[in-house]
Every structure is written in structure tokens, then in C-alpha cells.
Amino acid sequence: MKKKYKIDTNIFSKELLGFWLYLMSDCIIFCTLFSVYFILVDNVAQGPSGHNIFQNNLIIIETFLLLFSSFSCNLVLFEMKNKNLYMVFLWLGITFLLGLLFVFLELFEFFHLINLGFGPTRSGFLSSFFVLIATHGIHVISGLIWIIVMIKYVYTFNITNLIYYRMLCLNLFWHFLDIVWVFIFSFVYLFGMV
């Protein structure tokens, strides 16, 4: 006889407290990196500033990729509640592909800037810019690895409370990365273009 279970959807449950604390520590890291960036933004050492190097089209595409991946990541939880395995795999795959495209565009931007001679050693501004964007990119890559692990878990164990809980943590992490990206987009790229 198949065991019935009810999925707990409370994002403020005591089981998630540790993960919320982790997200807060990540938030402190990004706040520190933003502070360093804002302190060094005018230290261009006779090199380029943001309005000289930022590419509007690339940044907008990156933003849409990450925002759409957040939407698709949310649909994974919805389909888990409905116990629709096919759609869970589909939305996890779409989230993974969108995140992977985002990372490729970030790497393209980095290599493009370095090829132009605007690497992280050029100025304080570029150092802080590269560290902030690379830290976000490393977090996105970590999220992509987590998505692969979740695909394996769901494939192996089906949908259980533990799998749902892990997916909920991934979802919170992915949304956190989106929020950080919105800040990067707004305060680094948009203000940097002015």
C-alpha cells in the first residue's frame, strides 16, 4: 500500500530556519561587495568607467534570462504540489538552461572586457566590478549544480516531503540570486551607464 503524505508548504517553518540564516549570511557578503563597489566606483585610474564598457543589450538579455528562470523555478514547486513528475522535470530543465545561458553571457562579458584590456587589475572600479559579478556568477553556478542534484533526487526518489523541502530551499536560493541581480542591474549597470 502506497504511503500518503501531505507536502508542507510553509516557507517560515522551523525546518527552514537554518537555510534562512545561510541566506542572511550570503546577504551580508553581497552587501559588503556592493559597499566596496560603491567606494571604488570612481577609482578608474585613467581607465574606463561604467558608461564606457557596459553593453545595454547583453545586460537586458541576462536580466530577462534570470527573471524567467526564477518564474520557471517557481513552477517546479507548483508542479510538485500537483505531483506532476513530467512537468517538474520540464521546469527544472528550463530553469537549468536559462541559468546556464546567463552564466555563458556573464563569461562572454568578462572575456570581452579582458580582451579590451579592461581586466580586474586595471583599476579599483574594475576590480570591485569583477569580484561582485563573479561572486554572483559563482552562486548561479552553485544553483545549477543544485538543480542537477534535484533532478537526480526526483528521478530516484520521486516527490517526497524531503525532496519538496530541498526544492523549496533551492527556490529560495534562486530567488535570492534574482534579487541580488536586480540590485546589480539597477545600481551597477544602470547607474554606471549614466
UniProtKB/Swiss-Prot annotation:
Question: What Gene3D superfamilies does the record tag this protein with?
Answer: Cytochrome c oxidase, subunit III, four-helix bundle (1.20.120.80)
GO terms in the biological process aspect are: aerobic electron transport chain
Query: What InterPro entries does the annotation carry?
Result: Cyt_c/ubiquinol_Oxase_su3 (IPR024791), Cyt_c_oxidase-like_su3 (IPR000298), Cyt_c_oxidase_su3-like_sf (IPR035973), Cyt_c_oxidase_su3_a-hlx (IPR013833), Cyt_c_ubiqinol_oxidase_su3 (IPR014206), Ubiquinol_oxase_su3_dom (IPR033946)
Q: Which domain of life is it from?
A: Bacteria
Topology in the lipid bilayer = Multi-pass membrane protein
**Pfam families from the entry?**
COX3
Family annotation (NCBIfam families): CyoC
| Quaternary structure and partners | Heterooctamer of two A chains, two B chains, two C chains and two D chains.
Query: What name has this protein been given in UniProt?
Result: Cytochrome bo(3) ubiquinol oxidase subunit 3
**UniProt source species:** Buchnera aphidicola subsp. Baizongia pistaciae (strain Bp)
Query: Gene name, please?
Result: cyoC
